[in-house]
């Protein structure tokens, strides 16, 4: 899954694009411990239930499960669900604060990847989809599949 430019996607939150209408994306760094980096490089990360909050001018990532590293002892290992600090420029954070305070907007992690050796997280500013929006998305996806099948047969 290596893309050009030294980017290797380690984990993707595909469910977020179904549950949220993503309005804007941000690339952020993440503050990690050594064993967390090793686990992430091994692909042992789950972004599904994650979300980010802005507190005291800092962005924090919650509910991201990074499995403990297999080779490390329990003493040196990390807490799998600990809150992790995201690294962003102050201007980006100020911009986020204004947008997150709007009704119904939330920050969700979309993707975790390696970029030139550094672990990065793509955050999406999203609005939760209603049930009928999800059904519409599913209907559109099914129509696309049907069209592709028809083209393939012809």
Curated annotation (Swiss-Prot):
GO terms for molecular function: RNA binding. Its main location: cytoplasm. It is found in: Cytoplasm. It holds the Pfam family SmpB. Belongs to the SmpB family. GO terms for cellular component: cytosol. Residues 133-154 have a biased composition (Basic and acidic residues). Required for rescue of stalled ribosomes mediated by trans-translation. Binds to transfer-messenger RNA (tmRNA), required for stable association of tmRNA with ribosomes. tmRNA and SmpB together mimic tRNA shape, replacing the anticodon stem-loop with SmpB. tmRNA is encoded by the ssrA gene; the 2 termini fold to resemble tRNA(Ala) and it encodes a 'tag peptide', a short internal open reading frame. During trans-translation Ala-aminoacylated tmRNA acts like a tRNA, entering the A-site of stalled ribosomes, displacing the stalled mRNA. It comes from Synechococcus elongatus (strain ATCC 33912 / PCC 7942 / FACHB-805). GO terms for biological process: trans-translation. PROSITE patterns: SSRP. This is SsrA-binding protein. Keywords: Cytoplasm, RNA-binding. Residues 130-154 are annotated as: Disordered. InterPro entries: SmpB, SsrA-bd_prot, SsrA-bd_prot_CS.
């Amino acid at each position: 899954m290596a893309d050009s430019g030294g980017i290797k996607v380690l984990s993707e939150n595909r469910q977020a694009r179904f549950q949220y209408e993503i309005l804007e994306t941000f690339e952020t760094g993440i503050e990690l411990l050594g064993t967390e980096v090793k686990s992430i490089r091994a692909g042992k990360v789950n972004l599904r239930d994650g979300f980010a909050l802005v507190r005291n001018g800092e962005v924090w990532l919650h509910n991201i499960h990074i499995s403990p590293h297999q080779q490390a002892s329990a003493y040196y290992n990390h807490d799998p669900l600990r809150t992790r600090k995201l690294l962003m420029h102050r201007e980006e954070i100020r911009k986020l604060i204004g947008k997150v305070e709007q009704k119904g907007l939330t920050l969700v992690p979309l993707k975790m990847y390696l970029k030139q050796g550094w672990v990065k997280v793509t955050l999406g500013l999203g609005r939760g989809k209603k049930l009928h929006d999800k059904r519409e998305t599913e209907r559109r996806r099914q129509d696309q599949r049907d069209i592709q099948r028809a083209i393939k047969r012809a």
